[in-house]
């Protein structure tokens, strides 16, 4: 078996409210291997988003260990997209590259190819308000 790019051991998240202690995640353990497709499924409120938020460093765990392979980058699409309505589809896609100072002709071409692959090529110069919900998520 390949070396995992991400190891999660006994991850737990407990929320404290005025009335009670809520266990959102209890002892989640998993080894993520490069190239594998993973689906975290379950009923509403079972901790799926909490796990993803912790892995994306948007929230902290109450307990457990998370070990990333060196130089790994994690991408995560939230349920609600975060597109800027005043930017075109292309400009929304290029924004992260601009902020990281990684924008060049090669990366622009790569983004155009991705947009074409995901059926968004005809919307490169469109604004998010004309996109369906699914299209907005693909742009995100």
Regions found by a protein language model. Name each.
Residues 41-43:
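The feature captures the beta-strand-to-loop junction immediately N-terminal to the Walker
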Residues 127-131, 135-136:
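Conserved ABC ATPase signature
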Residues 39, 139-140:
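ABC ATPase nucleotide-binding domain "signature" region
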């Amino acid at each position: 078996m390949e070396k995992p790019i991400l190891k999660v051991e006994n991850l737990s998240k407990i929320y404290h409210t005025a009335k009670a202690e809520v266990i959102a995640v209890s002892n989640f353990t998993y080894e993520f291997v490069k190239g594998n497709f993973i689906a975290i499924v379950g009923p509403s409120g079972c901790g799926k988003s909490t796990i993803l938020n912790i892995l994306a460093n948007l929230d902290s765990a109450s307990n457990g260990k998370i070990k990333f392979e060196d130089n790994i980058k994690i991408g995560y699409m939230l349920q609600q997209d975060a597109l800027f309505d005043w930017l075109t589809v292309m400009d929304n896609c290029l924004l992260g590259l601009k902020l990281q100072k990684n924008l060049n002709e090669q990366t622009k071409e790569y983004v155009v190819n991705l947009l074409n692959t995901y059926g968004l090529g005809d919307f490169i110069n469109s604004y998010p308000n004309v996109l369906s919900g699914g299209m907005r998520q693909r742009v995100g």
